[in-house]
Amino acid sequence: MESVVRRFAAACAAEDPEALLEILAADVVLVSDGGGRVLAPLRPIRGAVEAARIAVTLMSAAALSIEEVNGRSGIVLRRAGRVEAVVSLEVSESLVTRIWVVLNPDKLAHWLNHGNGADPSRG
């Protein structure tokens, strides 16, 4: 699973939806939670092409790091040193079948309260 998470992060960092399509299941679902406080899709996004477009857009110009999210590898997005989103993936047979993107600042409290959301690799 971690290799799929790394490929997902690399494709998003490169803003390369075609590379992302290689690891997305055709019927992948992207669910985002902005909590009404930040801009995020209001409904689940279904299908690889649209999910790839949304994922790349959400993660563009962000510093991405692979970190433990809900007990498994996930992706933390930072801009200007602040956590803006946490991404968790469900993987089946080496393909991403579900993408959860938490953008809601209230739900990011754990990440924001540990080092102010700063990148832990920066010391």
What is the predicted function of each stretch?
Residues 1-123:
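C-terminal and inter-domain tail/linker signature
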